[in-house]
Amino acid sequence: MSAGDVHVTGGPASAPADDAAYEDSEQGYAAGLRAWDGLPGIPASSGALIRDSRGRILVLKPTYKSGWTIPGGVMEANGETPWEACQREVFEETGLRVSAGRLAAVDTRPAKARRAMGLRFLFDCGVVTDEQAASITLQSTELSDHAFLAPSEALARLRPAVSRRVAAVLETGGCRYLEDGRPVAGVPDE
């Protein structure tokens, strides 16, 4: 290393040379907790893009807010991953079990008055059979209706931020990084 170069490791100057071993040690774990303690949390949620055999998108009508949305919801603070949240929410809301999905987008929702910044993960969970589509059982405390709609009709019915997110994914088919549902200059698609 030449003068002016900096090498940052996961622990203090007295940490072992093996960063992974340090992070797994009690000392490293405690140091990690102290480093994160007091930092603000960022709310995160996961959603599922689910289609039927005719390419129509599954949309849901919530009882607790206006407009339509896609299956999904908030990640639990118990260590749940975005994919686990997607699977859990789809099952809770529709009775469908999704076992495969592709990360389609990560969307940063900007902070607004009385609302913190948030992260939204969108997974493309593929196509359900006609039998699976017919078996959907809605979570009645949160949802009043569902429909499979042609993409253009689904985009028109979805809440604006969700519509932008889904449209961005449908546009490229790759994984997208978005901010408020919009592509970001300088961040190429997958």
Predicted segments with their positions:
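Acidic, metal-coordinating catalytic segment for phosphate/diphosphate chemistry
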Residues: 2-47
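Nudix hydrolase/Nudix homology domain
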Residues: 2-9, 66-68, 140-190
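Conserved Nudix-box catalytic region and its N-terminal flanking loop in Nudix hydrolases
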Residues: 52-92
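Unchanged
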Residues: 75-99, 107-162
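Conserved beta-strand and immediately adjacent loop positions that scaffold enzyme active sites
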Residues: 47, 56, 145
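Conserved beta-strand residues within beta-sheet cores
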Residues: 45-47, 97-100
